[in-house]
């Protein structure tokens, strides 16, 4: 069956332009205005884009199905136009051996409605310390290696992880957080925190590890990606790394672009890690989006 979709704004060649699409038996086909179609659908000026990719999702299965499952998470992804998602390894068991990874990939094959590519953990048990996983054994089935939710605390351990990741052609995807700088904090160490007597999380707890890891990436030649940057210092470090030609990228999240710690005054439920930072940090993130420093 052939269906032509008309009156669409199609994303082609880096921009949106008016056009139409021909779908034949569920697949896009070369469209010619004169080609016959079994039916025509007027999209009324809707935007049409290729399938989107989310490089940082938490499907939480196996281990935590009360939080999310592969079935529910991928259904939500499909609803939003995402056809590929990369699943973080905060699971039980953590995907730190081929057998543990297989528990997840079996569920993916059974339940996923979009393409799911998993991350393996960097350390056994995804602890951010201790022993590294077998990178070579896990590499064929994963998009990269991450201990997301925990920073790898030892520079020596991270350097060896980067060497092993580089050897198998996979990126290190890092949650950057220096544990000894957290000091029991739970919101950003800024004006709101001090005014109301809360325990704060300093910006240095993030950017200090970003700084360390970029130096290690330069030393090892590893491709390196920083998860959910939240501070202006992190943005500037990534900007400088890119200017030096390093294979460094980063992401942020919508709440860090829309909100800051001042918004805690009106809504105390805004608790996440990393925390909402200052207005100056938010502005730096927006500038990083605008100039291409922040990739995702």
Predicted feature residues:
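Short acidic/polar active-site loop segments enriched in Thr and Asp
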Residues: 82-84, 114, 143, 295
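Alpha-helix-loop-beta-strand connector modules within alpha/beta enzyme cores
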Residues: 98-115, 164-174
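N-terminal metal-binding scaffold of metallo-dependent hydrolase/deaminase domains
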Residues: 1-36
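Active-site metal-binding motif and surrounding structural segment of the metallo-beta-lactamase
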Residues: 34-48
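Active-site mouth loops of central-metabolism enzymes
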Residues: 55-68, 89-91, 117-130, 149, ...
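Divalent metal-coordination and catalytic microenvironments
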Residues: 8, 21, 26, 45, ...
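Histidine/acidic residue-rich metal-binding segments in metalloenzymes
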Residues: 130-296
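Metal-associated gating/positioning segment near the N- to mid-region
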Residues: 46-111
């Amino acid at each position: 069956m052939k269906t032509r979709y008309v009156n669409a704004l199609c994303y082609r060649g880096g921009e949106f332009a008016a056009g139409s699409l021909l779908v034949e038996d569920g697949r896009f086909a070369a469209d010619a205005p004169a080609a016959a179609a079994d039916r025509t659908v007027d999209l009324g000026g809707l935007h049409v884009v290729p399938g989107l990719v989310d490089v940082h999702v938490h499907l939480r299965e196996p281990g935590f199905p009360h939080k999310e499952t592969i079935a529910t998470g991928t259904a939500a992804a499909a609803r939003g136009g995402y056809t590929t998602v990369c699943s973080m390894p905060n699971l039980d068991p953590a995907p730190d051996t081929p057998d543990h990874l297989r528990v997840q990939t079996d569920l993916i094959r059974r339940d996923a409605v979009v393409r799911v590519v998993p991350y393996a953990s960097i350390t056994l048990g995804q602890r951010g310390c201790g022993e590294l996983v077998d990178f070579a054994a896990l590499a064929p089935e994963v998009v990269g290696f991450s201990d997301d939710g925990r920073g790898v605390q030892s520079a020596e351990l991270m350097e060896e992880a980067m060497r092993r990741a580089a050897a198998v052609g996979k990126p290190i995807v890092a949650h950057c957080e220096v544990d000894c700088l957290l000091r029991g904090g739970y919101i950003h160490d800024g004006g709101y925190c001090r005014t109301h007597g809360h325990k704060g999380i300093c910006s240095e707890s993030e950017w200090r590890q970003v700084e360390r890891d970029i130096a290690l990436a330069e030393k090892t030649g590893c491709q390196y990606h920083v998860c959910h940057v939240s501070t202006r210092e992190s943005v500037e470090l990534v900007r400088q790394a890119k200017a030096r030609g390093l294979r460094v990228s980063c992401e942020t999240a919508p709440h860090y672009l829309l909100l800051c710690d001042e918004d805690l005054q009106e809504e105390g439920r805004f608790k996440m890690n990393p925390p909402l930072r200052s207005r100056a940090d938010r502005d730096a993130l927006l500038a990083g989006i605008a100039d291409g420093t922040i990739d995702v």
